[in-house]
């Protein structure tokens, strides 16, 4: 019934504990238990897929009822923790809405958590012109509230209309 790809078997939510945007410890499993949770791995200085994906999810959430919005959490896990401090990550995510929070911390833990969901994350690369890029998968893993497992994955190119259609289905699963 989803516009995303259904996972069979579903993925278990990673046991990832990093620093949240409020500067306090944020445990992904504990903080999002029983909520529809969309998890994305990326970085705030990303020139393309990260801001557009967050923007599409934000636009889709704005079209939802309060009941759906209240049950959805979007967690952005940075793949560039050296530059994406909790404070800067929080400021960037605030532009997308109150449903968005971020996690920053040990890159090796981030890479392990991403890999457990079939998402690749590479170490950031510094280029001769001073820019830094972080190669990462562009998938959004959707965890359902009933069992806190990822049953659906969305790839790059998923539209805000696709998310808007699926969010009510995800929220009541």
Name these PLM-found stretches.
Residues 28-57:
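Short active-site neighborhood of thiol/selenol oxidoreductases, capturing the structured segment around
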């Amino acid at each position: 019934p989803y516009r995303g790809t259904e996972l069979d078997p579903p993925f278990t939510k990673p046991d990832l504990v990093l620093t949240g945007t409020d500067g306090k410890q944020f445990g992904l499993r504990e903080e999002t238990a029983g909520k529809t949770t969309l998890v994305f791995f990326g970085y705030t200085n990303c020139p393309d897929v990260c801001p557009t994906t967050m923007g599409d999810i934000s636009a889709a959430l704005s079209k939802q009822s309060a009941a759906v919005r209240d049950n959805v959490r979007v967690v952005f896990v940075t793949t560039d923790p050296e530059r994406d401090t909790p404070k800067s990550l929080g400021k960037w995510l605030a532009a997308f809405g109150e449903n968005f929070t971020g996690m920053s911390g040990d890159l090796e833990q981030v890479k392990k958590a991403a890999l457990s969901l079939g998402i690749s994350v590479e170490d950031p690369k510094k280029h001769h012109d001073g820019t830094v890029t972080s190669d990462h998968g562009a998938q959004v893993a959707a965890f359902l509230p009933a069992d806190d497992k990822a049953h659906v994955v969305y790839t790059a190119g998923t539209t805000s209309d696709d998310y808007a259609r699926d969010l009510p289905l995800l929220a009541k699963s």
